[in-house]
Every structure is written in C-alpha cells, then in structure tokens.
C-alpha cells in the first residue's frame, strides 16, 4: 500500500503548489518536466527505482491536472464576468441563507448547452420561499469570487464556486420539480435536524447544538464562535473525526466488527452524514479515512495511516483541485497528520511512567489520568501542524487550547451523542426529544461557559500583531525541532521552560513600549469604520467601535487590548450611532469589562442606540449622555469631549474629542462635515495638535482647509477600508498634503499606533 502513498502524496503536493503558490501558467511546464524526469527512474535500482518513478508520476499528474482543470472548468466560468446585469436561468442548489441585505444561495447556471458553472447569488428579501431544485430566472451582474470587498479571497473558489452573482430586480420562480431529487436529500435531512433542534433544545444552547451536529456555525449565539476560537476549541463545530467515528462505532457495535453488512452500513451512514453537514473537507476526510480503516480487515490488509491519509487527500483534490486552498481542508489534514506523527508515541511514553494502584479508588483515579493523558497527547498532536496554519490564516494562536480541550472534551463528546439522539427523537416524539435535550444541554452549557470565561482572559490567545510575537513563533518551532533531534539527551522540562521564557519575553517586549508610554493612540484597522484606542498608565478609553472588516470590530478591539494584558476598558465613547462607528459594541461588551459609556443624547428612536442601551444595562455599564462639554482624566491624559454642534443628521450631531498628554495633543472629529468643523473652530478653543484622526474616513466633505489651518496637525491617520464611497477622497488627501501632514491609512498599514513617551 505504500506505493499508493508514494504516488498520492507527490500528486497532492503538486496540486497544492499549483493552486496556492505558483503563477497560473507554471504548472503545465512543470508537469511536463516532472513527466520527463520519470524517465530517469531506470538509472536507479531496487526500491529506489519505483519510488523515483511514482514520485515523478505523482508530481506530473498533479501539475498537469491542475492546469487542465483550470482550462476546462475555471476559465469558462470566468468568461461570464461582466459589468452589466444579464438575465440567466439557474437551478437552486441550497436553501437560501439570510444576510444583512436579503438572502444568498448557491445555484447552477443553466445554458442551452447544459449545466454551467456554480454561482453564489446575493438577492433581496423579495425572493420568496425558494427550495433546492427550483428553477429561477433573474438578472445578475456576475463577478469573480476571488475578489471579496476588494481583497483576494479563496473561500468560494476552494468550494468550486468561481462566480458571485448580484441580483438586480428580484428572482422569478420558473419551475419546481414534483419530487425532491436524490441530490438534495441530505439538505432536506439537515433542515429537518435543524428544525428539530430548535424545537426541543433550550434557546441558550440550540445554536450550539445546530453547529455541533450539522456544522452550521452561523447558528451559534453572537460571539460564541470567537469564544471557541480564542479558547482553542473552535474545531468542535467543524464536523470531523469526533462525529464520524461515533456514528461508525455505534453501527459496528450493533452489527459486529467483522460484519460486512455492518461495515457497508457504517460507510453509507458516514457518507450521508458528511453530505448532511455540507460535505466540508473535514467531514469528508473523516468519512473516507474511517471507511478505509473499516474496509482493510475485510480485504485482508493492515491499515496503513500514511497511505490512508495521502489517498484520501488525493481523493478530495482530484475532483476539485482548488479545494487545496480551503482552510478547513488544511487544518483537518494537518491535525490528523500531527496525531499520527506524535500522539501515540507521547501517550505510550506517559502511560509507561504512570504508576498502578490496586485499590478501587486508585484504579478509578488511574483511568481518569489515562483519559486525561491520552486526550492531551491527541490535542498536542493536532496542534503540531494546525498551530502554524492558524497563525498564517488567522494571525492568532490560542495559548489556552490544550487546557480547555482537557476541560471540555468529555462534555463535547457527551453533548454530541446526547444532542444527536435528542434531535433524532424530536423528529417523531417531541416530548421525548425535549427530555433528552434537557440532559444534553448541561455539557453544552459547560463548554460555552468555559470558552466564554477563558476568552475574556488576557493572553488566552496571542494575536500576532508584532514582529516579536512572530519571531517567538518561529523560535518556538525551532526549539521543538532541536528537542526532537536530541530528545534522548534532553529532558522535556528544558524545552518547555525555554518556550515559556521566550513567550514571556516576546509578550513583554511587544507590550512594554505601549504600556510604558505617556500616551498611546492606536487607530484600529476595522475596515470601513472607526475605532481608536487611547492607552495611558494602564488605563484605556476606546472611541467608537464599528467597521466592515471580516472580523467583528468589537473582537478586534478586545483582542488588541487583551494583547496588552488587560480585559478592562475604562470607558467607551461613541461619537454617533452609525454601525461603522458603533456596530461592534455588542461583542465588545461581551468580551471586556466596560464600566462607563459616553454617548451623544440624540436620535432617541435609533434602533442601534436602543440596542446599545439595553446591552449597557444588562452588563452593568454606567451610561452618561453628553449634552454639554465634558472633561475627565485617565492615566496621564486629559480628555475633553465636545457636545454635538450640528443638527440634521447623526454625522452632524456627533461628539468630538480633544486628547492632551503633556505636549502631545490629538483631535478626533468623528464623521463631522466641514460646516460643523467651522462651528468647532469658532466656539471651542482648539490648540495646535500633533495628530488628527481624519473625519468621516477621509470624505471630501470633511477635513476642511479651515480646520487644518486652525489646528495645524503634523500627522493624520485615516481609518477606512473597502467601500463604494470613494474614501479617502483625493480632495481630502490633497488638503492634508498641502497642510504638510504625514498621512497614514489603516487600509494599507493595518493598526496604526502612535506612542508619546513624554518629556
């Protein structure tokens, strides 16, 4: 079987290179070169000959297939891209999902020649009740899925969707099949399970069980997925080996290990369950690998882990090479590779050192230790390769992951078993389902409670914001490699101590300049929005918290503050109630302790204002409405908050702030336009400032010449991201340049930090 491994692994590696790293035209000549290289195999003897031949064949196959697939499937799909909407016919391929502006759904474009490419369509609320299999017509503008919000993205391409469609005038239902196609049975089964979960489970855990059982992470309570990420257990809501192995084990247990019927039923059940959960790479990997392990005894072969892993990887990549860019696939196979490589050796070593006890209590205690040590070895093995992958893709690493996995693994296993049983029972017997759900809810609440509590701790996760932290990450793996090389001579305590020491040194080196400065002003990169952190003397004030970046702006602010070693925000100031300035407040209040909230007393009927006030009351925040100018101090800073000076709209009725620390002064104007800026100059005493947080994301109607002449800023930072408004406007940039400002853009630089050391 190892011959299959020598073919599958190079082929998969070539596909990864062709999709993720190499220029588009390079796989074809590389494939031809590798094929020619295989002709050199007769120059070798013995096993080396077939290893060279299989490796060359695998590389050639991978490179050539990647090139051919792009020509046959991706390029024809991209040919539909255009600036103007065109009416097309589509077959709906999934239940529509609600979005902030309507619904989205995957659909197959139908042409006169037959079935065309898959398209992710975004439409308004007027679509009606669409079902998988429906035939619809709509005018859509088709764009490449490789560009989302102006940035490179591989989320859709890794799923075989190369086009995004934006419906212009609604969606018209043309036809509906009389019977549901077999292709859509798993989706209807998933919908039935999700409906059953909502019926039988309490509201506080229904979303968690929907994610745990069906993989639908969008059902999680607000902020729960971020809690799971920071605490290192987000993998539990990605359907994988934990879920699949239970189904297979239960079937085999009922029908016997050597039963062919039991084996094939288990395989069918696993494949169907993977389809129910959306055919994610992690679910398919688990289903196929478990199937190979079940089939091996029936065909008289010993299971070979490297062969099984590489063969399943190739099986997933051949029908869809661009799945190589899927983060889910990379994390899933990385976790299993790490477990295969080190977990068994670790657990054997630890269990050999474990003493035996003869008394009943001693035996029970030993079993608990065995479970804990085996769980820890699996966790560490899974983290071996997934940690650098997570650091690369998410710029964050959970430091609490091993501990939280130990605390929650039993609850996750029990919750999945109990939750699936309750959901299935609820399909026919709702009363029985509710009774079982009441029991299953207990471990789920434990998992959510632990994840939420740990996520609020400083340093529970390390966001790679600094070169020092990235350097530590590289050093940590260097220490690990050196220990593996000399593990017979080096005690494990030495590299463990080195890892802890270097981590502490990296964290202190990163945080010390910020914490020791008289004042640090950080314009956070929240996309098209604003969020500015003022930090002084260990105390922090956040001005605004909104944006349209991929991460919740509340999470971004909380991550940044917790990276400085604190989970307390002394005050939150909101200039006005627009989502690009206040949309992240719910998650911010869920993550941090915020005792004071300063708000403008305007637009009392605004829904966002009402939501913020309700959350403030629920979290025990003291709310101060500012109708007059207010002045207060924190750390070494004096902060003056100017009451609204305009009228007519939220932008004009917002707060503005002047921050003073020694000789350093900064001005924040929110979304103030030039008319209100002139009022600010006229009615308030504005000094010359060092830093201007440019108003309204660099709009041409803000940052007037009068304001720049009045305050003469030396530096200016513009908080903006992908938008359709033209921010920052060329006119604003020209005025700032003419005023002699050094200009910094969060869009290009990420978080922008200014540290004032004092005299």
Task: Label every PLM stretch briefly.
Residues 1-79, 189, 285:
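N-terminal leader/targeting segments
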Residues 1-42, 434-485:
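Membrane-embedded alpha-helical segments of integral membrane proteins
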Residues 6, 14, 54-57, 222-402, ...:
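Hydrophobic alpha-helical transmembrane segments in multi-pass membrane proteins
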Residues 60-235, 555-562, 568, 602-604, ...:
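Membrane-interface helix/helix-cap signal primarily in integral membrane proteins
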Residues 158-294, 571, 596, 639, ...:
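Aromatic-rich juxtamembrane segments at the membrane interface
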Residues 217, 317-325, 452-571, 617-691, ...:
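Core dinuclear metal-dependent hydrolase active-site scaffold
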Residues 569-580, 602-603, 692-696:
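Metallo-beta-lactamase
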Residues 596, 677-751:
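Cap/insert and terminal regions of metallo-dependent hydrolase folds
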């Amino acid at each position: 079987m190892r011959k299959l491994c020598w073919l599958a692994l190079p082929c998969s590696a070539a596909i990864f290179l062709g999709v993720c790293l190499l220029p588009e035209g390079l796989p074809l000549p590389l494939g031809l070169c590798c094929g020619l290289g295989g002709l050199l195999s007769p120059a070798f003897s013995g096993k080396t000959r077939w290893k060279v031949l299989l490796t060359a064949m695998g590389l050639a196959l991978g490179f050539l297939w990647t090139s051919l697939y792009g020509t046959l499937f991706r390029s024809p799909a991209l040919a539909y891209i255009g600036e103007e909407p065109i009416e097309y016919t589509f077959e709906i391929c999934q239940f529509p999902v609600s979005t902030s502006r309507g619904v989205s759904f995957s659909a197959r474009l139908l042409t006169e020649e037959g079935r065309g490419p898959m398209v992710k369509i975004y439409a308004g609320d007027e679509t009606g009740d669409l079902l998988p299999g429906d035939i619809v017509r709509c005018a859509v503008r088709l764009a490449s899925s490789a560009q989302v919000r102006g940035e490179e993205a591989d989320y859709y391409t890794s799923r075989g969707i190369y086009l995004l469609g934006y419906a212009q005038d609604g969606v018209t239902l043309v036809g509906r099949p009389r019977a549901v196609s077999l292709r859509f049975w798993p989706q209807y089964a998933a919908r039935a399970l999700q409906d059953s979960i909502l019926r039988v489970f309490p509201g506080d855990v229904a979303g968690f069980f929907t994610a745990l059982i069906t993989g639908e992470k969008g059902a999680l309570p607000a902020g729960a997925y971020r809690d799971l990420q920071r605490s290192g257990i987000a993998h539990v809501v990605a359907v994988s080996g934990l879920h699949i192995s239970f189904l297979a084990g239960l079937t085999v247990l009922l029908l016997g290990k050597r039963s062919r019927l039991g084996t094939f039923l288990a395989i069918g059940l696993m494949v169907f369950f993977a389809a129910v959960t959306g055919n994610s790479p992690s679910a398919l990997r688990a289903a196929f690998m478990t199937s190979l392990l079940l089939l091996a005894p029936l065909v008289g072969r010993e299971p070979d882990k490297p062969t099984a892993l590489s063969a399943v990887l190739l099986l997933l990549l051949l029908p869809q090479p661009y799945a190589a860019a899927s983060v889910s696939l990379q994390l899933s196979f990385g976790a299993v590779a790490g477990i295969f490589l080190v977990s068994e050796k670790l657990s054997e070593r630890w269990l050999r050192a474990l003493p035996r006890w003869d008394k009943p209590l001693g035996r029970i205690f030993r079993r608990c230790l065995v479970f804990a040590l085996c769980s820890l070895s699996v966790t560490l093995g899974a983290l071996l390769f997934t940690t650098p992958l997570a650091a690369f893709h998410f710029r964050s690493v959970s430091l609490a992951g091993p501990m939280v996995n130990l605390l929650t693994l039993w609850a996750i296993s029990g919750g999945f078993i109990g939750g699936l049983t309750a959901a299935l029972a609820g399909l026919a017997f709702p009363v029985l389902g509710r009774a079982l759900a009441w029991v299953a809810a207990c471990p789920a609440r434990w998992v959510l409670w632990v994840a939420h509590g740990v996520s609020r701790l400083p340093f529970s996760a390390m966001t790679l914001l600094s070169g020092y932290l990235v350097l530590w990450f590289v050093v940590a793996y260097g220490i690990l490699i050196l220990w593996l090389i000399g593990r017979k001579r080096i005690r494990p305590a030495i590299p463990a101590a080195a890892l802890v020491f270097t981590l502490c040194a990296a964290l202190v080196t990163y945080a010390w300049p910020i914490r020791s400065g008289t004042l640090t002003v950080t314009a956070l990169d929240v996309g098209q929005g604003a969020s500015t952190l003022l930090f002084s003397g260990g105390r922090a004030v956040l001005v605004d918290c909104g944006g349209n970046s991929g991460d919740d702006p509340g999470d971004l602010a909380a991550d940044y503050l917790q990276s400085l070693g604190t989970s307390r925000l002394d005050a939150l100031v909101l200039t006005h109630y627009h989502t690009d300035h206040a949309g992240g407040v719910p998650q911010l209040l869920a993550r941090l302790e915020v005792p004071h909230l300063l708000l403008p007393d305007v637009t009392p009927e605004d829904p966002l204002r009402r939501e913020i006030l309700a959350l403030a009351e629920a979290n025990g925040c003291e709310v101060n409405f500012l109708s007059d100018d207010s002045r207060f101090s924190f750390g070494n800073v004096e902060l003056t908050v100017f009451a609204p000076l305009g009228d007519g709209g939220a932008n004009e009725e917002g707060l503005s702030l002047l921050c003073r620390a020694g000789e350093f002064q900064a001005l924040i104007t929110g979304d103030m336009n030039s008319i209100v800026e002139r009022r600010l100059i006229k009615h308030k005493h504005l000094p010359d400032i060092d830093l201007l947080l440019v108003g309204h994301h660099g709009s041409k109607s803000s940052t007037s010449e009068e304001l720049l002449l009045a305050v003469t800023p030396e530096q200016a930072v513009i908080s903006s991201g992908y938008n359709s408004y033209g921010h920052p406007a060329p006119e604003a940039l020209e005025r700032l340049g003419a005023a002699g400002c050094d200009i910094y853009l969060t869009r290009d630089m990420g978080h922008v930090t200014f540290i004032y050391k004092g005299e």
